[in-house]
């Protein structure tokens, strides 16, 4: 029902458009009433004047004012349509309403009846969208069918040239442009009007009237058993046969269903090219004009029965549906491709923008890189100059350090030499101290010896003086005693002489001791000087190798010859050592 409704709407659209004089999409209510009445008549739909008047009343409460004409058309007409009306009569009524307004005034190579058939074929082949157009693929299909029906070869190159000159702003042709294209003879050059008209009629019969095959054949009668020539017309559910091809005198029908079959028969009774059509209640024997026609009819009937078994539509409708689905698929693919292309274009534009942004960024980066490279080179030059300066300074510092190291090495060597010298000085100082100690011991011994000699000398002097006094006293006492005293004097003089000699000897020994003492004193002074000299050297060297410290606050010892060459602690240590030696002696 949906397909039938779509086909009916195409014819109604033409009629409605013809009534829309100002192309505003609106038609007067009186005209719509007339159109609706005519549609109900040709479509054999019960006509309800009350519903019609209710729908088209003058106030604004009716459905037309709110929803337009389509709701009424669907509800009151199209939904009630049955497949029992005359399609040709319906199309002719719609054609009558629109032909005068739209058909070209240019002279055509075809009749108005042929133009009507082209118009109906257009509605069959047009796309299911409004305004109605026929696309170039369907135009090519129709022109091929017409050319084939005229018995001439198809000029594909001519059609390709036509498509090249086709208006790119349009997706296809309108019904009136298609009529003008067929009627101007552009694709039927060399053909007479009758041939073109026959071709249009043949294509019309196939596409619109569902005529699958037609032609003259001889049929055997059922009652009289005679053979009579009839004009046979094969349709999807029926084979009708007429007296002639004008279809005015119909003689009967052969109803086809899935249980029918067709068989080839051998020649008999002088009849050739026989075949048999078996139906549920009847069998029909038919004779074709030749074997080719026989085979074509058998094949056509067999294909029709096979389609009935499958429940498939006629081949031309199925082919139309396949072409539409293919175009729909191609259109969807094209739309998808266009969408993808648009997305790709957008993506490309985005990419271009991104690339432009990247290019700008790269240019900026290149500029920054160049600037940075310039700065880097400048920095590198500065760094190289600084590095060279640093290198020179480092070399100078290294040289200075090497010199300092050499100097320090030299100073260290000198320091080590001074240390060695200081060690030698310490040893020599030790030896000098030992010599001084020995000299002091010798001095002490000589001093003690000298003191003892002085004591002995003093004792001898005292004794001599005593003897001298005694001698003087003895001289003064008596002369007698003088002799004795003389003797004693002589003895005493001898003794005195001996004492003098001893005294001289002692004096000599004292002088020797004094000389020895002077020698020892000189040696002691020399040792003291040597000790002082070594101490000064040691102090000097020690001052070179040790930190400067506060000087000692201990007072120097004073001897007969000046400041002592030793400290109080050293003196105490030596006194302790002398006492220990005395104790051991």
From Swiss-Prot:
Tyrosine-phosphorylated. Residues 210-306 form the PH domain. PROSITE patterns: PH_DOMAIN. GO terms for cellular component: cytoplasm; lamellipodium; nucleus; plasma membrane. Keywords: Cell membrane, Cell projection, Coiled coil, Cytoplasm, DNA-binding, Membrane, Nucleus, Phosphoprotein. Residues 316-532 form a coiled coil. The keyword Nucleus applies. SMART domains: PH. GO terms for molecular function: DNA binding. Gene3D superfamilies: Pleckstrin-homology domain (PH domain)/Phosphotyrosine-binding domain (PTB) (2.30.29.30). It is found in: Cytoplasm; Cell membrane; Nucleus; Cell projection, Lamellipodium. Its main location: cytoplasm. Phosphatidylinositol 3,4,5-trisphosphate-dependent guanine nucleotide exchange factor (GEF) which, independently of RAS, transduces signals from tyrosine kinase receptors to RAC. It also mediates signaling of membrane ruffling. Regulates the actin cytoskeleton as an effector or adapter protein in response to agonist stimulated phosphatidylinositol (3,4)-bisphosphate production and cell protrusion. The PH domain is essential for phosphatidylinositol 3,4,5-trisphosphate binding. The SWAP complex consists of NPM1, NCL, PARP1 and SWAP70. This is Switch-associated protein 70. It comes from Bos taurus (Bovine). The gene is SWAP70.
């Amino acid at each position: 029902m949906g397909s039938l409704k779509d086909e009916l709407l195409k014819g109604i659209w033409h009629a409605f458009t013809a009534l829309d004089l100002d192309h505003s999409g609106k038609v007067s209510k009186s005209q719509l009433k007339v159109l609706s009445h005519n549609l109900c008549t040709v479509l054999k739909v019960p006509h309800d004047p009350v519903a019609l008047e209710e729908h088209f009343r003058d106030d604004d409460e009716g459905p037309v004012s709110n929803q337009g004409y389509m709701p009424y058309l669907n509800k009151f007409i199209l939904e009630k349509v049955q497949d029992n009306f005359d399609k040709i009569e319906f199309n002719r009524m719609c054609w009558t309403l629109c032909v005068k307004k739209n058909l070209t005034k240019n002279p055509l190579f075809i009749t108005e009846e042929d133009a009507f058939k082209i118009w109906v074929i257009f509605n069959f082949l047009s796309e299911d969208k409004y305004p109605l157009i026929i696309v170039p693929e369907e135009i090519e299909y129709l022109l091929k069918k017409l050319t084939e029906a005229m018995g001439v070869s198809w000029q594909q190159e001519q059609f390709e040239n036509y498509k090249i000159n086709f208006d790119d702003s349009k997706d296809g042709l309108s019904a009136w442009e298609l009529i003008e294209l067929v009627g101007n003879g552009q694709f039927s050059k060399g053909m007479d009007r009758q041939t073109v008209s026959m071709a249009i009629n043949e294509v019309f019969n196939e596409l619109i009237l569902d005529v699958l095959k037609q032609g003259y054949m001889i049929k055997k009668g059922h009652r009289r058993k005679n053979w009579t020539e009839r004009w046979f017309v094969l349709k999807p559910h029926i084979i009708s046969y007429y007296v002639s091809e004008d279809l005015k005198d119909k003689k009967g029908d052969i109803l086809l269903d899935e249980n029918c079959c067709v068989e080839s028969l051998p020649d008999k009774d002088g009849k050739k090219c026989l075949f048999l059509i078996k139906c549920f209640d009847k069998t029909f024997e038919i004779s074709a004009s030749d074997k080719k026609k026989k085979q074509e009819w058998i094949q056509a009937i067999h294909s029709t029965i096979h389609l009935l078994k499958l429940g498939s539509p006629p081949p031309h409708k199925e082919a139309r549906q396949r072409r539409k689905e293919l175009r729909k698929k191609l259109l969807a693919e094209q739309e998808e491709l266009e969408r993808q292309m648009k997305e790709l274009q957008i993506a490309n534009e985005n990419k271009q923008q991104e690339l432009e942004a990247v290019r700008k960024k790269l240019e900026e980066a290149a500029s920054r890189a160049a600037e940075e490279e310039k700065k880097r080179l400048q920095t590198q030059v500065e760094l190289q100059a600084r590095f060279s300066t640093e290198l020179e300074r480092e070399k100078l510092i290294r040289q200075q350090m090497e010199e300092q190291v050499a100097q320090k090495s030299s100073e260290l060597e000198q320091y080590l030499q001074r240390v060695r010298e200081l060690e030698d000085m310490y040893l020599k100082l030790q030896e000098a101290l030992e010599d001084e100690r020995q000299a002091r011991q010798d001095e002490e011994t000589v001093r003690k010896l000298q003191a003892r000699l002085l004591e002995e000398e003093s004792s001898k002097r005292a004794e001599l003086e005593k003897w001298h006094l005694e001698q003087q006293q003895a001289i003064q006492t008596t002369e007698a005693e003088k002799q004795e005293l003389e003797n004693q004097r002589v003895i005493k003089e001898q003794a005195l002489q001996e004492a003098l000699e001893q005294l001289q000897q002692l004096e000599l020994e004292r002088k020797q001791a004094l000389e020895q003492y002077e020698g020892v004193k000189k040696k002691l002074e020399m040792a003291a000087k040597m000790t002082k000299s070594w101490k000064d050297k040691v102090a000097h060297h020690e001052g070179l190798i040790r930190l400067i410290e506060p000087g000692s606050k201990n007072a120097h010892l004073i001897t007969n010859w000046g400041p002592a060459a030793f400290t109080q602690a050293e003196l105490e240590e030596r006194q302790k050592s002398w006492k220990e030696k005395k104790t051991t002696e």
